[in-house]
């Protein structure tokens, strides 16, 4: 039995009609070699922890040899990009290789990004560059470390293949894992193409594969949509609580199971700046940090329109009305945890709002503030107060906060201990990613490996790596990132 045949691998998506995808063989890069292998993630799927003794892994994931159990395909979908419908989308550089089951029996997609040309590449070359591959690997693992729903990265490879973007860069490959790669845009493609039988089939399969709890409902398609609304609200609440800006929330970048998906021009907040724009192509600020909750609703409305042949309009409207309620509830729960507040009290929302106003007015680093708050000593507030220009206003807010804390049953030490488990010391600031990329382009991958370790456990102190928790230099603040990948 071959190595791959010994694993639990399926190809369910390839059994769908051909309007869903096109079979495509990967095009190998020159001299592909491992840059990093996620051994902790690999263990969950009975994959080797060390890739260097397993040439089958290199051959398969580089595209040199496609195992017989794989059925590489490029998915067809559509989507609204910056609010405009685009029917000509699909996997332009990535291939769904197969699905693999973890030790608990859950199926995950094996997806190869940077695999070469597909029928949906449009004017692209089907490649991914080292720069964007490093960013996606690090951010997906950072989000996993933070406990935020996300796709994962099993590994990445570098190569000797030059790829032209603004200049010549190094071609690379990312092995992405997700419970599904089905996007809002899959439903939009079928709806706008008037493929209504296929739309129903996709909905049936999504329920079967990802929302089996809906099978016994009187209105299973509505139940599916309610679940998508709920998961999307939870995901975006998590983004807002941790200070994450996705950067390009097009509907083709929205997962139907509420996982953070397609890492491109993302950014974590440095100074608390509500209108932070991380995508330098977002001239109008459509996807600014403080617009993400609104765009979540816009995208869900676009999905609802695509599901209208299956679900009554009034039911869709009621489901959409729940989004903002759910988002507010999830966000409030998360902020209470970050502030060490277990009980729900009148005035909590105003406490949060006044905190955000103060952080914004004083340009205080969001991650550093929340972490410092988890060490706050009621007898010595100075460490937190010193983060602010307006120390008097900061002192007033801290006094309000400490008064609120007295309503809790936890001791001071217990409360702070819990806060340190939800307020990270380390996040993937864009300047850290950029420094790692610069080194990697020179053949030094040490920062990539250090960051991948730190970001997997971002709440721990890691005293030997304090410099990765430092404030960004001026050049590293408010970095806007290109969509080029």
From Swiss-Prot:
Binding site for ATP: 90, 92-93, 113, 125-126, 176, 183, 262
Cofactor(s) required for function per UniProt: Mg(2+); Mn(2+)
Chain positions recorded as Mg(2+) binding sites: 253, 262
Assigned EC number: 2.7.7.-, 2.7.7.108
Record's keyword annotation contains Cytoplasm: no
Its job: Nucleotidyltransferase involved in the post-translational modification of proteins. It can catalyze the addition of adenosine monophosphate (AMP) or uridine monophosphate (UMP) to a protein, resulting in modifications known as AMPylation and UMPylation.
NCBIfam families: PRK00029.1 (NF000658)
Protein name stated in the entry: Protein nucleotidyltransferase YdiU
